[in-house]
Design a protein with these regions (language model features):
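Short beta-strand-loop/turn "lid" adjacent to the catalytic site in phosphate-handling enzymes
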Residues: 50-98
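A short, N-terminal amphipathic alpha-helix
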Residues: 39-55
Length: 98
């Protein structure tokens, strides 16, 4: 499974995908005052509420338009899953021209 995060100016959209299918999703407000730990707790609660096992995740991917929150949310996801959270951007080697 993959944890996908889309961090926008107003909302953080979170989705869980298994074999190209959306398993579950939710939305919460983007809040620059929240810490990485607070975002980790939000993500943890979402996964627990949906009975998802952390060991089944291959990692996380984050897209963000808020530079000041990108690191916090990426750290929250990687700490929770104990796996890398890739951040989409011009430095990520994905085989596509951006």
């Amino acid at each position: 499974m993959l944890l996908l995060l889309d961090l926008g100016n107003t909302n953080l959209f979170v989705g869980v995908y298994r074999k190209r299918s959306l398993v579950c999703s939710f939305r919460t407000y983007s809040d620059k005052t929240k810490s990485s730990f607070e975002y980790q707790e939000i993500l943890s609660q979402f996964l627990k509420n949906n009975n998802l096992d952390l060991d089944q995740f291959e990692g996380a991917i984050l897209s963000s338009v808020i530079p000041s929150l990108t690191r916090k949310v990426a750290l929250a996801a990687s700490s929770l899953l104990n796996k890398e959270c890739k951040v989409l951007g011009n430095q990520l080697k994905c085989g596509l021209s951006i």
